[in-house]
Amino acid sequence: MSEVYHLYRPGLKTRLIFSIGILAVLALWITAMYIVFGGEKFGIFMGIFAVYFAPGFGKESLIPIMTAVGCPLAAIVSGIVILDMTLAILISFNFDLLLKIPGIGHALRYATDKSATTLHDHPWVKGLAGTGLFLFMYIPFMGSSAIITTIIGRLLAVHPKILLPIIFSGSLCATLTVAVGVKAVIALWFANPWYAVIAVIVTAIVIVILWKLWQKFIAPRFAKDTK
């Protein structure tokens, strides 16, 4: 999958517009968080959001923590979506340049190898094209992330003008789904802890059953050779 390194190299103007634009949005969001929450809460929230960049931490682990420390739903959703879009845009428009930066380049090469493996393991992503990328971004327990989804998009030669809206919608829907689910479980817990436990178990069972049915009956119909 080395061809990913040679796909889509935009001009300098395009790189600057999109890169500076999304970094400005990120800076405005951080400033707004500081104005709204002040010093102590701001430090706690930003520290937890920073963990989102660490391997193994996704929406399904970050959102419950953010909810537990009292972060409002709007801040959680906006923060995760902006972080996802920041990563997606920077990688989409600067992939070849980022590869040359020590540390970052090594991490991107590792992510590219992981993306190629993921695409091989889930060929339906290619078969379903844009819908496949959306589903991959949306389903949290597949090991998906903005980084992996963006690189898979490059592997499939999907232009950023198509890929970025897919990542945005997938990130927004996934974040809202997890956040609303966590809020519902917390509400059930305060009503009766057993309700919350039963709800989590039933939800987990339903998800596993649906995933198994998808793998067995639906995904093979859309699988395409990724070699």
Kindly label every feature range from the protein language model.
Residues 47-74, 140-150:
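Transmembrane helix boundary and interhelical junction motifs in multipass membrane proteins
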Residues 23, 27, 123-126, 146-161:
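Membrane-helix boundary/interface segments in integral membrane proteins
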Residues 57, 82-90, 168-179:
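Membrane-embedded alpha-helical segments of transport systems
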Residues 146-151, 173-184:
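Transmembrane alpha-helical segments of integral membrane proteins
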Residues 65-66, 98, 152, 181, ...:
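Hydrophobic alpha-helical interface/terminus motif in multipass membrane transporters
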